[in-house]
Structure formats: C-alpha cells, structure tokens
C-alpha cells in the first residue's frame, strides 16, 4: 500500500536522537537489526564496532525506558552466533557458554547481556535472537557468500578471472534471511520474553558453498592441494578458478558454528528448513548470474 511505511533517520551512536524518535513514534515493537556487522571490519575499527554494537543496544533500551514505554514496547535484539566463538559445545544452543573471539563478538555479548538486564530489572519484553549466518540475494558484497555467488556469475559470463578466498574449511550454519525474519517476528508474539537460537541445524564448509555456487552456473569445480595451496579448477577446461589468499584469513577465526534450533521449532512452531541450503545457494547464484549478464551487456554498449 502506498505510504504505508514512514522512514525516520536514526543513529545508534546518538542517544538523544533515539530518545526523540522513540518518544515521537511510541512503537509497539522495535527490531534492532542495526550494527557494524562485519567481523573482519571489527578488527580494523574496534572502537566504532563497540560504540554501535555494544552501547548502541543500551541506547535503544534506555530510550524505551526513558520514554516510559517499558510495559508497552517490545524490543528484539539481533544477537549473533559469533558469541560462541571458540566453541565449547557442538551444536550450539541457548545454554551453550559464550567464548567471543573478535571485537564484533565481544561488543555483541555486551548487547546480549544488557537486553537480559533490562528484561529483569524493568520487566521489559526484551529478547535476543541468536542469529546464525543468514544470507540472501541482498547480502552485502563484502560477505563471503555474496562474494562467492557474484564471482561465480561473473566468471561464468567472462567478466572475472578467478575468486580468492580465505579459510575454506570454516564451517557455518547458513540459512535464508527471509525465513529468519519470520522467526524474529514469532519470538516477539510470545506471551513470555525468551531468547532463542535461530539456525537451520545443518552446517557446510566455505568450500562446499563455493562448489554449489559454481555448479548453479554450470561449472564443475575440481579441487587440488590443501591449506593455502588449495585451488579449484574448472573440470571441463582445467582453468584455475578458485584459490586461497592468506590475506583473507582473520587474526582469530571461528571455524565451527552449528546451531541447534530445537527450542524455536518446539516453542514457536518455526520451520528452519522452509528454504533449504541448496535452495538458498540457487537463489543467490541465479540472482547474481542475472546481475553479471546485465553488467556484461552494459560493458558491451
């Protein structure tokens, strides 16, 4: 419907602005999805990441409290599987101990505990959704899954020579962002505020994601070598299409994230497999192949 959405400017580093906005709008629900959400960037800009990802959550909660909306406004905080970091349990669930392993994860842990504190101290309906990796065709291009699907499409169209990646053995639990948003909403419709893991319960390597993205573009990858010497070749032509570049390794890397969505399935009735992993890769690869075709057409104009 036209004009059904009103956009307001807001900044998680500006407490007075957030208080003004919350007081003006008096929302029934707040979904805080704002963050500096790139792990590698948090090593490059740790202070900024802490200001937005840690104190930003506090500013949202405090805005609700200061405006007198603790009993009428629900708050959802987008937390992260990166909290588990150097994992102490596989798969990870709501009771798994946290071991953050990056400035991003440390900042997010502060936000997680502030949500619980405001819930307990002020009786707020404030909840954390511990989101495992959620991807889509709208994913930022600096994230590995989108980097892969864009490269696969461009290579298939002759626009790019090869793809460089970091740790090919990293294990991730990848789901479709659209399905995860449904779970966020379900969490906020409960009578009792609780924290939930949002995950598929299935994990794959970066290597496997790469292989499937190229397959969706009609290219079969043949792997040779190990570690930093690993390379992926086009099985049909023998051309090297994928290689490892140590530049893309993180100073500290989380290598085994795997969520247990049992609580979300049981309590919320949520289906984490609405979109399968294979379908997710296909959606992203198809979208980015079409984009590569448009780029090629413009290049040839």
Model regions and ranges:
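N-terminal Rossmann-like NAD(P)+-binding domain of SDR-like oxidoreductases, especially those catalyzing
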Residues: 1-134, 178, 184, 188, ...
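C-terminal substrate-binding subdomain of Rossmann-fold SDR/epimerase-dehydratase oxidoreductases
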Residues: 3, 10-11, 141-147, 151-301
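A short local structural element in Rossmann-fold oxidoreductases
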Residues: 19, 88, 139-140, 210
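A short beta-to-alpha transition loop/helix N-cap that caps and shapes the active-site region
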Residues: 84-86, 137-139, 205-207
């Amino acid at each position: 419907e036209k004009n059904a959405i009103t956009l307001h400017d807001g900044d998680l580093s500006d407490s007075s602005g957030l208080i003004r906005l919350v007081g003006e709008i008096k929302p029934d629900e707040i979904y805080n999805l704002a963050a500096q959400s790139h792990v590698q960037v948090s090593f490059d800009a740790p202070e900024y990441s802490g200001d937005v990802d840690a104190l930003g959550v506090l500013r949202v909660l405090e805005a609700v409290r200061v405006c007198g909306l603790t009993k009428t406004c629900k708050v959802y905080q987008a937390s992260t599987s990166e909290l588990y970091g150097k994992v102490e349990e596989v798969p990870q669930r709501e009771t798994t101990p946290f071991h953050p392993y990056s400035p991003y994860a440390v900042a997010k842990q502060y936000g997680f505990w502030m949500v619980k504190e405001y819930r307990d101290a002020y009786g707020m309906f404030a909840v954390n959704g511990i989101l495992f990796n959620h991807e889509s065709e709208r994913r930022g291009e600096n994230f590995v899954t989108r980097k892969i699907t864009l490269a696969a499409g461009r290579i298939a169209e002759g626009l790019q020579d090869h793809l460089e990646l970091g740790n090919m053995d990293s294990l991730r639990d990848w789901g479709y962002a659209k399905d995860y948003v449904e779970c966020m909403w379900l969490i906020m419709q409960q009578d009792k505020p609780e924290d939930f893991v949002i995950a598929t319960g299935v994990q794959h390597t970066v290597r496997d994601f790469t292989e499937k993205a190229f397959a969706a573009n009609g290219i079969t990858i043949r792997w040779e070598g190990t570690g930093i010497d690993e390379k992926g070749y086009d099985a049909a032509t023998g051309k090297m299409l994928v290689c490892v570049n140590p530049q893309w390794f993180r100073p500290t890397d989380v290598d085994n994230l795997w969520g247990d969505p049992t609580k979300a399935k049981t309590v919320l009735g949520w289906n984490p497999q609405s979109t399968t992993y294979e379908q997710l890769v296909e959606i992203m690869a198809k979208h980015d192949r079409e984009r590569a075709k448009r780029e090629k057409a413009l290049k040839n104009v």
